[in-house]
Amino acid sequence: MVIKAQSPAGFAEEYIIESIWNNRFPPGSILPAERELSELIGVTRTTLREVLQRLARDGWLTIQHGKPTKINNFWETSGLNILETLARLDHDSVPQLIDNLLAVRTNIAAIFIRTALRHNPEKVRDVLTQANAVDDSAEAFAQLDYNVFRGLAFASGNPIYGLILNGLKGLYIRVGRYYFSNPEARKLAVNFYGRLEALRSEELYDQVMDVVRHYGKESGAIWHSMQSAIPRDIAEVRR
């Protein structure tokens, strides 16, 4: 187990999460007592207690007053906020994880973008205008692409779509930095934003789903061509 955290709390959190992932603390089992666990990890009980509360909020654990702390099946109890953690824990699963992320984005975007264009065209125009002044760099495009999809999600009038994008943000932008290092990916994105603006101005709302799905296929093809060289630190938080 290689843990890179720099603070005692960060170390304790990574230790427990990796122990759950590696089945040292399997789902359904009971976490060791606070005193035993704090000595095992090498942190104070106060620090450990704070970490356990945070992990419980993220769905890794269930803290029961007067009862031992239970390990959850995190696939059933956690939210989108653990995606980065999962990618960091198992680099070999990253391509499949990102494939799933892109499929979800395409499927929901086809719905919320059409709704946004139909019901909030002025806001859509404002969102798409961001693409007119973007720097031609991977970093800039990663942030732009996230902002465009998130902006269109909220422009749909259904904030749940926006909250989903919020949950994807960390991994989305980290993957985007790698994906948009390919000039063809940046060119494809600019063309896609331009096509959406054309559909908005011409009120061709019924074509939105086909355009979004076509973009999903084309961007997916570029992504698949880049998968073999995915950086091992793609899910690492920049310090």
Swiss-Prot record:
<dbReference type="InterPro" id="IPR036390">
    <property type="entry name" value="WH_DNA-bd_sf"/>
</dbReference>
<keyword id="KW-0443">Lipid metabolism</keyword>
<dbReference type="GO" id="GO:0003700">
    <property type="term" value="F:DNA-binding transcription factor activity"/>
</dbReference>
<keyword id="KW-0010">Activator</keyword>
<comment type="function">
    <text>Multifunctional regulator of fatty acid metabolism.</text>
</comment>
<keyword id="KW-0804">Transcription</keyword>
<keyword id="KW-0678">Repressor</keyword>
<dbReference type="GO" id="GO:0006631">
    <property type="term" value="P:fatty acid metabolic process"/>
</dbReference>
<feature type="domain" description="HTH gntR-type">
    <location>
        <begin position="6"/>
        <end position="74"/>
    </location>
</feature>
<dbReference type="InterPro" id="IPR000524">
    <property type="entry name" value="Tscrpt_reg_HTH_GntR"/>
</dbReference>
<dbReference type="GO" id="GO:0003677">
    <property type="term" value="F:DNA binding"/>
</dbReference>
<keyword id="KW-0276">Fatty acid metabolism</keyword>
<comment type="subunit">
    <text>Homodimer.</text>
</comment>
<dbReference type="GO" id="GO:0000062">
    <property type="term" value="F:fatty-acyl-CoA binding"/>
</dbReference>
<dbReference type="Pfam" id="PF07840">
    <property type="entry name" value="FadR_C"/>
</dbReference>
<dbReference type="GO" id="GO:0019217">
    <property type="term" value="P:regulation of fatty acid metabolic process"/>
</dbReference>
<protein>
    <recommendedName>
        <fullName>Fatty acid metabolism regulator protein</fullName>
    </recommendedName>
</protein>
<keyword id="KW-0805">Transcription regulation</keyword>
<keyword id="KW-0238">DNA-binding</keyword>
<dbReference type="InterPro" id="IPR036388">
    <property type="entry name" value="WH-like_DNA-bd_sf"/>
</dbReference>
<dbReference type="GO" id="GO:0005737">
    <property type="term" value="C:cytoplasm"/>
</dbReference>
<dbReference type="InterPro" id="IPR028374">
    <property type="entry name" value="FadR_C"/>
</dbReference>
<dbReference type="InterPro" id="IPR014178">
    <property type="entry name" value="FA-response_TF_FadR"/>
</dbReference>
<dbReference type="Pfam" id="PF00392">
    <property type="entry name" value="GntR"/>
</dbReference>
<feature type="DNA-binding region" description="H-T-H motif">
    <location>
        <begin position="34"/>
        <end position="53"/>
    </location>
</feature>
<dbReference type="InterPro" id="IPR008920">
    <property type="entry name" value="TF_FadR/GntR_C"/>
</dbReference>
<keyword id="KW-0963">Cytoplasm</keyword>
